[in-house]
UniProtKB/Swiss-Prot annotation:
Protein name: Protein LONG AFTER FAR-RED 3
Record-level GO BP terms: de-etiolation; response to far red light; seed germination
Protein family: Belongs to the metallo-dependent hydrolases superfamily.
Pfam family for this entry, one: Amidohydro_3
GO MF annotation: an example: hydrolase activity, acting on carbon-nitrogen (but not peptide) bonds
Listed transmembrane segments: 7-27
Length: 583
């Protein structure tokens, strides 16, 4: 099933006629040599295309015409898709053609959950993603300290203690190598961070410091902080961290956007630099200083839909009333975002039963449920879309219950409530997404990080019954939207699609919970038109349909059969608005 967005299930998608069009020739890297100007042809009366894409297998994500071999584009939008015979009338003086030579085209890929500027910033910081040994962790910090000015903050992130056996890092690991530089290293999930002793001293975090509501200071038996702060406790340190300049943030956006284009990403849903333990002003500063600047100076490279902290819902409402939701073809105002719990890796996701590896720990409510309900009620009543982070089974049920109550109180409308992650669901909860018309915004690649550790935290039975229930969500008619949560996981939609289809973790030779694998078509739909619909962007993009923005990706394969079976293709070229922006 494909969900309540009314895209029918397609079986045997490509007819023999389409396959006859697929060439076995290899398409070299696309560049200006592959464009030809068709000046010798007499322009037809009427509309002339700027660009004609021909001789390929074009998957449209549009149920009215799932496949075509050609596509005509004008002024950044799609004129028509179909056979070359039906499109050649758009050829005129100045029409440019790209011959796909049998290659596959898909709509521009949409990442439904990113933190774009955070990702761009992290690319220039101490990158600890994939580090699998304590010595390697410490060496990377030491190298950063040696290249930094005395007293400057050493910032980084991406570490995952499960990669080196589960032992949590502590300030003692890095104190000797960073005596004069405060260090702040965020775990890959964004819900835990390591501070060295100097950073703790600057922030005034001592043994007598109380745990804040919605957060935990990890402590030694003596009561002294270990250096690890979870969720809201991170706010004890973040105000002391050096403020990142406007220029650094602008450069982070450009760096992140260029990287996204290499992965075929043309649109992102940006949840902002908003995490437990951060101020709700960061998202607004980035909007004012970075996004509006990039948009007005025509420096945007990918389309971005912005979500803002739910505590600022009235501010977003005022802005939407003044400007509308579409600020430009590049910049869109989405809705509001909140958190109810933490993360599995930080043992702060909220569950009905305790964590096996930390007895008497059920996780955290990182926001008071009554306050969250009040904010949600007000934001929804004003017409704003609401997206709430929920990972644990209890957290998801709390949000499902709250959404149901809010919808009943505020009346019927097309609200498209979102739950971000929907990672662990109690029996029966997956069906409620479809019943309540709630978007399940999920990140398949997270399961690759969790597969080895979730049984240790929850037990094998709970892990198998509750974790990443993608097919169950589809069976319940939920709208499934795929994303990465970058920089928590890499921004790589083709890899996410492969994970959703295969569910084979690293070093495994079999699928984890194979019954929850989804079909290739469902995964691709969830990364295109469903992702657009999940953010109210489906009238603008998400499918290669006449009138929509001409965002598309050319892949490295000539075979739809192989692509749909192995999902092993790579990105050859990325087009945004009919213009090639990568390579």
């Amino acid at each position: 099933m494909t969900g309540w967005y009314e895209f029918p299930v397609m079986i045997g998608f490509v007819s023999a006629a389409v396959f006859l069009l697929i060439s076995v020739a290899y398409l070299p890297l696309l560049n200006d040599l592959y464009w030809s100007t068709l000046k010798s042809l007499t322009p037809p009366a009427g509309i002339v295309a700027d660009l004609l894409v021909t001789n390929g297998t074009i998957f449209t994500s549009d149920s009215s015409l799932p496949f075509a071999d050609s596509m005509a584009i004008r002024n950044g939008r799609i004129l028509k898709v179909g056979s070359f015979a039906t499109l050649k009338g758009f050829i005129g003086d100045g029409t440019m053609e790209v011959n796909l030579e049998g290659k596959i085209v898909v709509p521009g890929l949409i990442d439904s959950h990113v933190h774009l500027i955070s990702g761009g910033l992290q690319m220039a910081q101490v990158g600890l993603r994939g580090v699998s040994q304590k010595d390697e962790f410490c060496k990377m910090v030491k190298d950063a300290v040696q290249n930094a000015k005395e007293g400057s903050w050493i910032l980084g992130g991406g570490w995952n203690n499960d990669f080196w056996g589960g032992e949590l890092p502590s300030a003692s690991w890095i104190d000797e190598i960073s005596p004069r530089n405060p260090v702040w290293l965020i775990r890959m999930d964004g819900h835990m961070a390591l501070a060295n002793s100097l950073a703790l001293k600057i922030a005034g975090v001592i043994s007598l410091t109380e745990d804040p509501v919605g957060g935990t200071i990890m402590r030694m038996p003596s009561g002294e902080p270990t250096g690890l702060l979870i969720d809201a406790a991170m706010e004890l340190v973040t105000p002391w961290v050096k403020e990142i300049s406007v220029d650094e943030r602008r450069e982070a956006l450009f760096r992140a956007s260029k990287y996204a284009l290499t992965r075929g990403v043309t649109t992102v849903i940006d949840l902002g630099r908003y995490f437990p333990g951060t101020t709700d002003e960061l998202s607004w500063k980035d909007f004012q200083d970075v996004y509006l600047y990039a948009d007005s100076s025509k420096k945007m490279m990918i389309r971005t839909c912005l979500f803002f902290p739910i505590t600022t819902w009235s501010r977003l409402l005022d802005l939407k009333l003044q400007k509308g939701s579409v600020l430009s073809e590049w910049l869109y105002l989405g809705g509001v975002k909140a958190f109810i719990d933490g993360s599995l890796g930080s043992n702060s996701a909220l569950f009905y039963e305790e964590y096996i590896d930390t007895p008497n720990n059920y996780g955290l409510e990182v926001m008071d449920p009554e306050k969250l309900s009040n904010f949600t009620m007000a934001a929804d009543k004003s017409g704003l879309q609401v997206a709430i982070h929920a990972i644990g089974d209890k957290a998801n049920d709390m949000i499902l219950d709250m959404y149901e109550s809010v919808a009943a109180a505020n009346g019927d409308r097309d609200r498209r409530f979102r739950i971000e992650h929907a990672q662990h669901l109690a029996p029966g909860s997956a069906n409620r997404f479809g019943q309540l018309h709630i978007v399940a915004s999920v990140q398949p690649d997270h399961l690759l990080d969790d597969a080895d550790s979730v049984a240790k935290k929850l037990g094998s039975e709970r892990a198998v019954k509750e974790s990443y229930l993608f097919q169950s969500l589809l069976n319940g008619n939920a709208l499934l939207a795929l994303g990465s949560d970058w920089p928590v996981a890499d921004i790589n939609p083709l890899h996410s699609i492969r994970t959703a289809v295969k569910r084979i973790p690293p070093k495994w030779d079999h699928a984890w919970i194979p019954s929850e694998r989804i079909s290739f078509t469902d995964a691709l739909i969830a990364q295109t038109i469903s992702a657009a619909r999940a953010a109210f962007l489906d009238h603008h993009l998400g499918s290669l349909s006449p009138g929509k923005l001409a965002d598309f990706v050319i892949l490295s394969t000539n075979s739809w059969d192989e692509f749909s079976k192995d999902v092993s293709a790579s990105v050859l070229a990325t087009y945004v608005g009919g213009k090639q922006l990568y390579p």
